[in-house]
Amino acid sequence: MYTKERERELIQRTKELLKIKKEHIKTKEDAEAIIEDLRDVIRYHDWRYYVLANPVISDYEYDQLFHLLKDIESRFPELITPDSPTQRVPSELTKEFPQVKHLAPMLSLDNSYNEEDLREFDRRVREAVGIDIIEYAVEPKFDGAGISLVYEKDMFVRGATRGDGVVGEDITPNIRVIKTVPLSAEFSVYGIDRIEIRGEVLINKEKFKEINHQRLEEGLPPLANPRNAAAGSLRLQDPKEVAKRGLEAFVYQITYAVDKDGNNLLGNKLRYHYDSIKILYELGFKSPYKEIKVCRGIDEVIDYCREWERKRDDYPYEIDGMVIKVNDISLYDRLGVTSHHPRWAIAFKFRARQATTKIIKVVFQVGRTGAVTPVAKLEPVEIGGVTVSSVSLINEDFIKEKDIRVGDLVLIERAGDVIPYVVKVVTEARTGKEKPIQFPKECPSCGSPLVKPAGEAVWRCININCPAQVVERIIYFASKDAMDIRGLGEANIRKFYQLGFLRSIPDIYRLPYDKIIQLEGFGQKSVENLKKAIEESKNRPINRLITGLGIRFVGKVTARTLAENINCVEDLKDWSVEDLERLPDVGYVVAHSIYDFFHNPDNIKMIQELKRLGVQTCKEKEEVVENIFEGKTFVFTGTLSCCSREIAQEIVERLGGHASSSVSRKTSYVVVGENPGSKYRKALSLGVQILDEKQFIEMIKDHIPDDLKDKVHL
């Protein structure tokens, strides 16, 4: 559709137009000078996004262009043309699935990025309906893949993608395998005979991190973000594969509802948006019911939006803003819709988490397992309030697959606590001066030849005494997720290594404090605190020690599983691969990795040395302060304010109980924090005892292990 030369021109023109603000357009002549170029670049980016699914600018940059065009057309309506991008919604349809017409159009939302936009929206709504104070329902804006669900006579009959808003793709078989979509629901209790519900398919952030952790360990590139992972999963041709992806569906709008006589129920029997979401919640749908707040007036709306922007990273799902809807559905017809969006709703978008920038150079880093990772140094760019100046390029295959070169313009994404990621190279912006990336043949740290094991995508340094590996292993051992040694962070570890104080993990427990106190930046107090933290780490539960050993593929969850099934860490040297595979969370690859680690004499020697230095390698009575939770199984859901979920789980286990990640009839308690997930509903359905956070704190407050007391806020 576009030649390479034309694409290059449009990208260059995009950069120029992004510098233009609506205040710069003062006359009709100013508008006429840019409006066709503006439409051309928006059409081009629509094509890249919706047809190729391969955008070259961020959503924020696109919205800047789109809003500029809308502003010009609103001020000079005589310049509007029937084919303007503002007059239609682009399509993402392919021929892979049958097409189906929605019962009600699935329009986009108008976007706002500041308080002024929200106040202007409120002004228009108030003027249109003649009411001084409007009641709004405000809820999180999920960053997933849009779907519509149709139920007839209480039965699920169809699921579809958004498509062009009028026609979508029928993906019913794939939707049926998503466990949070009820296959039947008693809508008839509310007089509803046929209903269409709009929703979003998502992947929980923790699940997404697990998927990416596994992919990285296998040498595969991580998925860019939960949204792309969810959208890609929905379009798989095999529903059995879809079922494996851990997808969840949230519903957030009833777009069509009629009784058995065909009478419309929206705006009369279903009068308020908040109440309609409550109905869906009570019928077993996953919805933002507990997150929705009904706000009187725009000031309350703005406060709630800002509150969520501050806590967005604590929410279990990726959200990119808030949706503000007029709560009274009976006003919707009076407010109307445009060809693009309803006038009764608007999205408040959080700060952008994508941006384009240039690769300056590439360096190669060696990790604790010897994996050599290429890291691109970037022209610094702000993404979501954080300045990003480097990004991992994963491995050689990732570089080749995306054809990444030094000097390239790249689209970077940083979502929540997900590490920055190269979404794509803007090849259309290339000038011919870009240089291919040459992967080294020798370790950049120790000079040993690099090897690429069969079946892996990662080049490795196999010299276990490689300085870079040693330092990274020590950093990991002392980290928060492992032995949690405060004051022994990355900077101090690197300094101590350079000075010869640290050459192995056991060296942590024989640091020369008399020499450290003489270093710049260290005083009597800081050295005493460091010594105390190191001494305290000797009594960590053995699951933390197992984590700290840095066994490949073994994270916190697997380490806890191993610890539950042994008395001493050294016991694992007597386990066979088959024994290990019988444990939950341990498959063939992980079992072999554990087996190999404990059959390496150097590793056994290190564990024995740690034991001689006073590190607890066996379960001792001291590890369980009191067995008040003996025989009890706890499951945690939602965000706790008293402590992290990991600390809560550790307290339960130190008190003799078991912390599980799933709810069953054998579960003793489900502890519910803020924004609980599906585990809460499952507990209710199974009759499992529910504890709120206050009840849980009451149970543990007099029994918290000493070394965890400063991590719990009572």
UniProtKB/Swiss-Prot annotation:
Q: Where are the transmembrane segments?
A: none
Which Gene Ontology BP terms does the record give? DNA repair; DNA replication
Gene3D superfamilies tied to this protein: 5' to 3' exonuclease, C-terminal subdomain (1.10.150.20), 6.20.10.30, BRCT domain (3.40.50.10190), DNA ligase/mRNA capping enzyme (3.30.470.30), Helix hairpin bin (1.10.287.610), Nucleic acid-binding proteins (2.40.50.140)
Give the E.C. number(s): 6.5.1.2
CDD domains in UniProt: BRCT_DNA_ligase_like, LIGANc
Any Pfam family from its record, for instance, is Nlig-Ia
- UniProt: Zn(2+) binding residues: C443, C446, C461, C466
Q: Entry's InterPro entries?
A: BRCT_dom, BRCT_dom_sf, DisA/LigA_HHH, DNA_ligase, DNA_ligase_AS, DNA_ligase_CS, DNAligase_adenylation, DNAligase_N
State if NAD is listed as a keyword. yes
Give the cofactors, semicolon-separated: Mg(2+); Mn(2+)
Q: Name one GO cellular component term.
A: cytosol
UniProt keywords (A-Z) are:
DNA damage, DNA repair, DNA replication, Ligase, Magnesium, Manganese, Metal-binding, NAD, Zinc
Which residues make up the binding site for NAD(+)? D59, Y60, E61, Y62, D63, S108, L109, E139, R162, E200, K325, K349
- EC supergroup of this enzyme: ligase
Please indicate which superkingdom the organism of origin belongs to.
Bacteria
* Catalytic reaction equation(s): NAD(+) + (deoxyribonucleotide)n-3'-hydroxyl + 5'-phospho-(deoxyribonucleotide)m = (deoxyribonucleotide)n+m + AMP + beta-nicotinamide D-nucleotide
Q: Which PANTHER family match?
A: CHROMOSOME TRANSMISSION FIDELITY FACTOR 18, DNA LIGASE
Q: What does this protein do?
A: DNA ligase that catalyzes the formation of phosphodiester linkages between 5'-phosphoryl and 3'-hydroxyl groups in double-stranded DNA using NAD as a coenzyme and as the energy source for the reaction. It is essential for DNA replication and repair of damaged DNA.
Q: Which family does it belong to?
A: Belongs to the NAD-dependent DNA ligase family. LigA subfamily.
Q: What is this protein called?
A: DNA ligase
Species: Persephonella marina (strain DSM 14350 / EX-H1)
